[in-house]
């Protein structure tokens, strides 16, 4: 029985490695969990303090159909916990989202082109009331990658989501470059981009990164008003491989214009009656996490 279990594990890992063949960024996280925390001040007369902790859980399951096609199932979960504190009161509020991207990746026979398409249904709410269509968002993601050579790839595409504030389109473009056997640049702009350097190959990696992540959440008990969260980050990161496929990572950076803000239903008018979701000052943040990661540049 133990031998059969080991064979299954070996088969799963072999399948995942096959699915990474031709992937432009150097790794895929099969499981990734992290917690990001920041402390800031509100721009109010009470000198209120803000503490925000963001918990993430991400899963990726690539299933190889044949030498050119891979079926992809992903799951993203988030819990955004915000606290406001001043001399009069302390209040904590939680927002949640669950995203289930499903799609296909196709690579041409000559390995020059790769196309990925995902349908992305999402529930995003405080979940204080029964789940309904008011909590549902539906989006899509399309990305084409062209390999100029083994070290240089160009990517272009489009992201769309039906947010609670309206239709949200993001054109995508990027260049992945293996500058040396230690230095890599990769990502998809304007959402994420990394400059990564291998301090100790297969053990220790560090670098600089940028992240842009816009999303919205329904406030169920407040006439379906919503919170819009525009998150821009610049940060430094450190990845420590405690085992070949297990990585402990840490990030330290600064927010740019970060403020989860509440708005009235079907408007772009700020809902001032919810002080916890009013403007805060930019702040430094710290993020730590653990991932089951498979890199295509590990021997």
Model-derived regions: residue spans:
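Outer-membrane beta-barrel translocator/channel fold
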Residues: 62-64, 77-90, 189-286
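Sequence/structural signature of outer-membrane beta-barrel proteins
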Residues: 38-43, 78-87, 107, 120-130, ...
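Outer-membrane beta-barrel "beta-signal"
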Residues: 172-177, 238, 279-299
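Short glycine/proline- and aromatic-enriched beta-strand/turn motifs that initiate or cap beta-hairpins
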Residues: 24-85, 295
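Residue-level signature of outer-membrane beta-barrel architecture
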Residues: 61-63, 104-108, 146, 177, ...
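Repeated loop/turn-to-beta-strand initiation elements of outer-membrane beta-barrel proteins
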Residues: 66-71, 110-115, 151-156, 182-185, ...
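Residues that define the transmembrane beta-barrel architecture of outer-membrane proteins
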Residues: 49-55, 92-100, 132-138, 167-171, ...
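Transmembrane beta-barrel strands of outer-membrane/channel proteins
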Residues: 30-37, 73-79, 117-123, 156-160, ...
């Amino acid at each position: 029985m133990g031998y059969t279990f080991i064979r299954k594990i070996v088969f799963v890992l072999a399948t995942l490695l096959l699915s990474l063949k031709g992937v432009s960024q150097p790794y895929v996280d099969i499981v990734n969990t992290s917690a990001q925390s920041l402390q800031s001040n509100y721009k109010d007369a009470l000198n209120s303090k803000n503490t925000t902790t963001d918990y993430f859980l991400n899963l990726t399951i690539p299933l190889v159909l044949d030498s050119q096609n891979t079926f992809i199932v992903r799951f993203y979960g988030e819990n955004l916990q915000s606290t406001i504190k001043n001399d009069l009161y302390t209040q904590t509020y939680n927002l949640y989202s669950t995203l289930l991207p499903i799609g296909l990746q196709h690579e041409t026979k000559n390995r020059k082109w790769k196309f990925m398409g995902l349908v992305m249904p999402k529930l995003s709410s405080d979940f204080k009331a029964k789940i309904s269509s008011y909590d549902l968002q539906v989006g899509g993601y399309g990305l084409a990658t062209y390999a100029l050579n083994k070290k240089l790839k160009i990517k272009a595409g489009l992201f769309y989501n039906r947010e609670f504030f309206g239709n949200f389109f993001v054109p995508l473009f990027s260049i992945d470059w293996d500058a040396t056997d230690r230095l890599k640049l990769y990502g998809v702009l304007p959402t994420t981009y990394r400059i990564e350097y291998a301090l100790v190959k297969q053990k220790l990696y560090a670098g600089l990164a940028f992240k842009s992540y816009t999303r919205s959440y329904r406030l169920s008990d407040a006439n379906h008003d919503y919170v819009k969260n525009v998150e821009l980050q610049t940060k430094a990161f450190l990845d420590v491989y405690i085992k070949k496929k297990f990585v402990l990572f840490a990030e330290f950076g600064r927010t740019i214009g970060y403020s989860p803000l509440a708005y009235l239903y079907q408007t772009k008018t700020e809902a001032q009656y919810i002080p916890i979701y009013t403007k805060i000052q930019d702040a430094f943040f710290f993020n730590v996490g653990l991932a089951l990661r498979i890199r295509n540049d590990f021997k």
